[in-house]
Curated annotation (Swiss-Prot):
Its cofactor is FMN. GO terms for molecular function: flavin adenine dinucleotide binding; FMN binding; tRNA binding; tRNA-dihydrouridine16 synthase activity. SUPFAM superfamilies: FMN-linked oxidoreductases. This is tRNA-dihydrouridine(16) synthase. It catalyses: 5,6-dihydrouridine(16) in tRNA + NADP(+) = uridine(16) in tRNA + NADPH + H(+); 5,6-dihydrouridine(16) in tRNA + NAD(+) = uridine(16) in tRNA + NADH + H(+). InterPro entries: Aldolase_TIM (IPR013785), DUS-like_FMN-bd (IPR035587), DUS_fam (IPR001269), DusC (IPR032886), DusC_C (IPR042270), tRNA_hU_synthase_CS (IPR018517). The record marks 35, 95, 176, 272, 274, 279, 295 as: Interacts with tRNA. Pfam families: Dus. It comes from Vibrio cholerae serotype O1 (strain ATCC 39315 / El Tor Inaba N16961). Keywords: Flavoprotein, FMN, NADP, Oxidoreductase, RNA-binding, tRNA processing, tRNA-binding. The lineage of its organism: Bacteria, Pseudomonadati, Pseudomonadota, Gammaproteobacteria, Vibrionales. Catalyzes the synthesis of 5,6-dihydrouridine (D), a modified base found in the D-loop of most tRNAs, via the reduction of the C5-C6 double bond in target uridines. Specifically modifies U16 in tRNAs. The keyword tRNA-binding applies. The active site is at 98 (proton donor).
Length: 323
């Protein structure tokens, strides 16, 4: 099976990809979306969102990275796909699934699910423009409101000759509600269409991954939010590893401070780590206590100091446990 680290705008940036691919056996990653409007974007935009382009389109640990584009104009999507390919992108992914209101209001992301013909035009333009050896894939939801629309949408992607398709098994209207997941539609898509598929949505552990594979008949899975809830989720899903214990998560939080300070977002670190806690709290009850100690801190150094103190307390408490 394959497990892919999916895109999350504003969350899974190159620093997080670097860290998570060091500790997981991911098959490839997808960047945050590059927003395409009516122009050819300068190189620095691609390098900012995918600095891995300067390393052979791989993370420092060697995991390939696809560049994701989001837009609705076939010509400019194709022009920017060409540019990403020229810069060395491992692959081009096209976002037709983002449910964010601002993106949809500007006719991007999931808004295109209402217009399968436009999806066809965008995918075909990009596939025709990019050299054949570079894969062009797409990411969709089941539809805007009606999951039955997925078949027409998938047909549009397949007819445009995309190399692969990720299906988030909810509609746009379904948001991220667990009750709205509909894996069985991916199985129906698989039976109707020959395009290689990746299943996405509600895979939080090994059992979920196996259930998704069993239901969909697809053995390639993409994880996004869960990869932040449980930092080693890739190995949990792929190899049935135990979830990372809390003390190792704390060590990872300290490693993340080094990534941010060393990287280009040191000034954003206080907000970034608090954002990560919003995910960790779903899997680790201890995260609530630690977040309470950090929430009022606004500078990097006090946060790092508090994390060190907290880690020392954990180690001291563990040392006092009876053998």
């Amino acid at each position: 099976m394959r497990v892919i680290l999916g895109p999350m705008e504003g969350v899974l940036d190159h620093l997080m990809r670097d860290m998570l691919t060091q500790i997981n056996d991911y098959d490839f990653c997808v960047t945050e979306f590059v927003r395409v409007v009516n122009l050819l974007l300068p190189d620095h935009v691609f390098y900012r969102l995918c600095p891995e382009l300067q390393q052979g389109s791989k993370t420092p640990s060697g995991v390939p990275v696809k560049v994701q584009l989001l837009g609705q104009d076939p010509h400019w999507m194709a022009e920017n796909a060409i540019r990403a390919a020229e810069l060395g992108a491992y692959g081009i992914d096209l976002n037709f699934g983002c449910p964010a209101k601002m993106v949809n209001q500007s006719k991007g992301g999931a808004a295109l699910l209402q217009h399968p013909e436009l999806i066809y035009q965008v995918v075909k333009a990009c596939r025709d423009a990019v050299p054949a050896h570079i894969p062009v894939s797409a990411k969709i939801r089941l539809g805007w409101e009606d999951p039955e629309d997925c078949f027409e949408i998938v047909d549009a992607v397949a007819q445009a000759k995309a190399d692969e398709l990720t299906v988030h098994a909810r509609t746009k209207a379904g948001g991220y509600k667990a009750s709205e997941i509909k894996w069985h539609y991916i199985d129906q898509i698989r039976q109707k269409c020959s395009i290689p598929l990746i299943a996405n949505g509600e895979v939080w552990n090994y059992a979920d991954g196996q259930a998704c594979i069993q239901t969909t008949g697809v053995d390639s899975l993409m994880v996004c939010r869960g990869a932040l809830n449980v930092p080693n989720l890739g190995n949990v899903v792929k190899h049935n590893h135990a979830a990372m214990p809390w003390h190792e998560v704390v060590d990872l939080l300290l490693r993340y401070t080094q990534f941010e300070v060393r990287g280009d977002k040191g000034k954003y670190y206080p907000n970034r780590i608090k954002q990560w806690f919003a995910y960790l709290r779903h899997a680790y009850p201890q995260a609530n206590e630690l977040f309470g100690e950090l929430r009022t801190l606004t500078q990097v150094e006090p946060i790092v100091d508090q994390l060190h103190r907290y880690r020392d307390q954990l180690h001291h408490a563990a040392a006092e446990l009876p053998v």
